[in-house]
């Protein structure tokens, strides 16, 4: 069967396909397949080619009923005579089979019986369908037309019976139709079979019965049509009369059956329409299944075919005639032959079924959808529906009107244009322009009561003009918007087919409704509808004519309307300006009008007071409309005209100073968009000029386009750049936008340098970078963002490399150094409570990201790469940590300097290094004031400490030493440190404690590297040590707590520092001078902690004889004069360390120096503190007898001098104490002891 149906699809309209003799299953209605693609079953009348054969008057089934006999209802019949001899019997059997099928419907259809019932029902249906097809074939092949002369001769009995067959068929077909009744009158269980879905393809008897009824209704029409085509005359029935009481004929039966079939189909559709929401009207079909849809298509093709060759009604006439009866007030007024159910909403139903039936015209004779097919229209009836829809007396609701117009819009898409439709609708909407056309319970998606912007106005118009219809149009648009869609579609179609005449008709109708009184009556909603209408007309027709008329009409608006609806009027006018730009037309007229109005409002905004919030808000609303609209104009225009310059007038110069921060953001966003567009257009022109084979005419044209571009650029320099320049040191302008706008102007100067103002000439790029990138007084947030924009633009640095500014990279590096150092400058505060906060957390994430980006780009500079390369650092630092990257860069600079050999190279490197730093102390000065930032101080002291240490060799030069002196004075020896009554702030002291070793080591290296001794530098180093030894001493004199003392950390002689001798020397001097100096017999403060520090100093460093000479007298003095146990203990430990440094037997050097120191000690304290002296020397003797033995003469002489002084003879107690000392000194001591006893 599939092969036959497929083949029949390709039958030509003039030839009948010669098929084999294989029996093909006759076509029938079937929805037992997946029809989601909209295709019909291969068994259908359309797909099988049955409809085409019917219309072309071809053999209905050329491969069937070819045998001598045919099986009908289980019996064998002679094919060529069965219908003549047994017509009534066959129809009786047919009705009996229908009865049998109806009986099966009554049987309970459970799952166990479904297969059996399906098989029986399907067999009955097939027998009935085969019989009806047999009638068609018999009429076409076997029925002979009775000629006139045959009535004069005696007829053969068969001929006599054959002559009666047509009348008998008419009677039997009428009887069959009466027997099966109307589809609409079927029991609900049978009608419910339409929606039966069964994946197993097993259907209940009700499904088969329903589809057999459909087959019967359609095949009766086929039989009557074939009968009429065969006989070419009217056939009268003998048993029945027609509905009008006249004789029944094949023609009247056909018409009667058509009417009944239409009624049935309409009733089935009415049942579905009652469940359809207005918003779903176009989504839900009127057909319960594909078989009903096919029946509609069959009727369309058959009735329209008959209309071509006879006076019969077309399909639309049949449908219109019956739908009109729905509007009759009572069933009494309807024709008795029409049995239609009373519709709840006849108007809505008529729209709904009309649009769905119209779509079926796209389906051809084979059941294939062809959207390009010319469709038969039904505008006369649709016009009637439109008039009913917009009749005020009927009070049609908006939700209903939307559905009606949505259907109308779809029909406009199907059919040829009809200006009358627009005329009818405009008559209604012209009277209701002030209506919002809204549905209270349904908010419009994407559409507020008042359009938000000019661009949204154009977007609305563009959507209305789109050929693609929005499936959600009902919910997203009002009925007025749908009317605009209809207007656009009709006018566009009509102008394509008929030229400008339809547009002139529409224009006349619409223009005539607007006059001064009407314009004055428009509310805000009305004005919005007014602009939407005329924007749409401008989009589809003559924009200049429409725009000119709009300008004339706007003059009719009263001043009160302009003040209350000014924003909407501005939006509408700006929308026209945008449309001109989109169509690449000269915007001169609109630009001049709008720019003048903008200038006036900007002046009012400038002089308005800050407390006049309502007025300012109203003015700002208008100004925003202008700004947004002009931005769209520039972004939309493919080329710029001289009139574009008018849009950038003095109004901006007045507006900018009056703006607050949020308002400035809006204006600067506009500025950046316009700058980007100008540069884009300029680059396009340059590319076109650079093409090969450009003739002089084209060059002249491109040059002409360049002139208005330069004029627009000049306007931006005048009105915007001067303001940015004046605000670059303030925080009035948002910093990020200030940087972005300045970068955009820099790029504009690169592309179009001649447009820059005179004060930036002759090198505008360098001048702007100097203002916003290299100037130390600009906020670092601005500099970082600004330079990041430029560093990633190769064109900028090409311009810089060609300029006379040879140190551009050095200046950029200097700016980067400042940006890193000042990353915490915005977080200064009086009470700094963030000492332990992670420094990175104290910086805005945005600025850290910007710094990281700037660092990444900076490391691409050739100068930076060269520094790292010479320092033999292959892996560049990670830009994600700008602080660490700066540290590594500074260290690399120091390493690079140390690798240089010649004096000239070193001198140049020192100069370059100082350029990198610039006024570095000014960068960090904010952290050192009254307002502090712990994170900022930690950053400052850390990086500057690294700088001092890693650049020590550079600071050893005369060029750089001044900076080192200033660093020491500013960071380590500020005035607060030198004032005894003032304490350093806690965060500063913490930062110094962490970084002091770096400074001390660096200064020490400088001292070692200096070619000439620098007394001032040495004095500074000693002052630093003096100030901070005591400040960082622990509260308890515990040696273990002194391990992290910054001075001791510095003295631990790291491998990177060759010699710590100067540092140790100055440390010892500082201790001797400031921490071991007694005032009379009063010990210095915190003596125990100082002694602990000295003890740790001896352990950590290699002390020399000169160090002993300075420290030992003070230690000995402590042992003599202080009785505090902790002091004595620590002093003793110090004494032991000092003695241990002088090994026994050493000749000269430390041992001799030590002996000399003790001899002086004995002379100073021997007479008054003899017992303490002897005790101290006993301790020394346990470590180094040799030293004490050398002191025996001095001790003996001191003893005698003491006794002589007191004049009391021998001092027995003192001599005993001295004897104890001598007892521990071996033979020498014993000998001295004996001499004393004599």
From Swiss-Prot:
Its main location: nucleus. It comes from the Eukaryota. Degraded by the ubiquitin-proteasome system upon replication stress. The keyword Transmembrane does not apply. Coiled coil: none annotated. The keyword Cell inner membrane does not apply. GO terms for cellular component: cytosol; FACT complex; MCM complex; nuclear replication fork; site of DNA damage; site of double-strand break. It is found in: Nucleus; Chromosome. InterPro entries: MMS22-like (IPR042320), MMS22L_C (IPR029424), MMS22L_N (IPR029425). GO terms for biological process: chromatin organization; double-strand break repair via homologous recombination; protein localization to chromatin; replication fork processing. Keywords: Chromatin regulator, Chromosome, DNA damage, DNA repair, DNA-binding, Nucleus. One of its GO terms (molecular function) is single-stranded DNA binding. Belongs to the MMS22 family. MMS22L subfamily. Component of the MMS22L-TONSL complex, a complex that promotes homologous recombination-mediated repair of double-strand breaks (DSBs) at stalled or collapsed replication forks. The MMS22L-TONSL complex is required to maintain genome integrity during DNA replication. It mediates the assembly of RAD51 filaments on single-stranded DNA (ssDNA): the MMS22L-TONSL complex is recruited to DSBs following histone replacement by histone chaperones and eviction of the replication protein A complex (RPA/RP-A) from DSBs. Component of the MMS22L-TONSL complex, a complex at least composed of MMS22L and TONSL/NFKBIL2. Interacts with RAD51; interaction is direct. This is Protein MMS22-like.
